């Protein structure tokens, strides 16, 4: 259920058919999240009438390593019958000026075009707090990511072990 690029390791093929929501640090159960995501198209349609643009669903899964963030994303994709477009820092970051921003835009465009769940693994690599940026490209890549997030009509999932270093503006953009 996942599409990986650049020779990345394959994710496990077997996906759980149920999920123990007691392991989630949320008041929303796994089944409620699946139901909400299934209704996301009607949410986007209503929002389009108000704002004139589609709005997707943006989720941030955070916690220490090994707590099942990526596994829960895989579970959601299985329950929704959608494939995951998994992007890691090695797929996005470039040493060339402007190419990182272009890669971010391409990831969102591909997920939109193919109607896939877009999963950014270790998202702290993509949008660390701009106040701590030492170089201009650190700010511009975060700006590009934030702009793409707002315009993305699909399901976006970001995972991180380091929520405390994320840019405050990015945290405000997540629904869950």
Model features per residue range: what roles?
Residues 24:
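Structured alpha/beta or helical-core interaction and ligand-binding surfaces enriched in interleaved
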Residues 1-21:
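Interdomain "pre-motor" coupling segment immediately N-terminal to P-loop NTPase/helicase cores
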Residues 27-176:
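Walker A/P-loop NTP-binding motif of AAA+ ATPase domains
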């Amino acid at each position: 259920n996942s599409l990986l690029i650049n020779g990345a390791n394959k994710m496990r093929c077997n996906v759980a058919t149920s999920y123990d929501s007691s392991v989630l640090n949320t008041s929303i159960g796994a089944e409620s999240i699946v139901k909400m995501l299934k209704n996301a198209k009607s949410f986007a349609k209503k929002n389009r009438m108000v704002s004139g643009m589609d709005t997707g669903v943006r989720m941030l899964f955070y916690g220490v390593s090994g707590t099942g963030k990526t596994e829960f994303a895989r579970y959601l994709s299985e329950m929704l019958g959608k494939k995951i477009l998994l992007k890691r820092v090695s797929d996005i970051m470039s040493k060339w000026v402007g190419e990182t921003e272009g890669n971010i835009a391409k990831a969102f465009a591909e997920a939109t075009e193919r109607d896939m769940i877009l999963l950014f693994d270790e998202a702290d690599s993509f949008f660390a707090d701009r106040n701590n940026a030492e170089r201009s490209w650190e700010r511009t890549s975060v700006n590009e990511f934030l702009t793409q997030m707002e315009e993305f009509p699909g399901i976006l999932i970001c995972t991180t072990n380091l929520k405390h270093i994320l840019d405050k503006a990015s945290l405000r953009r997540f629904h869950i």
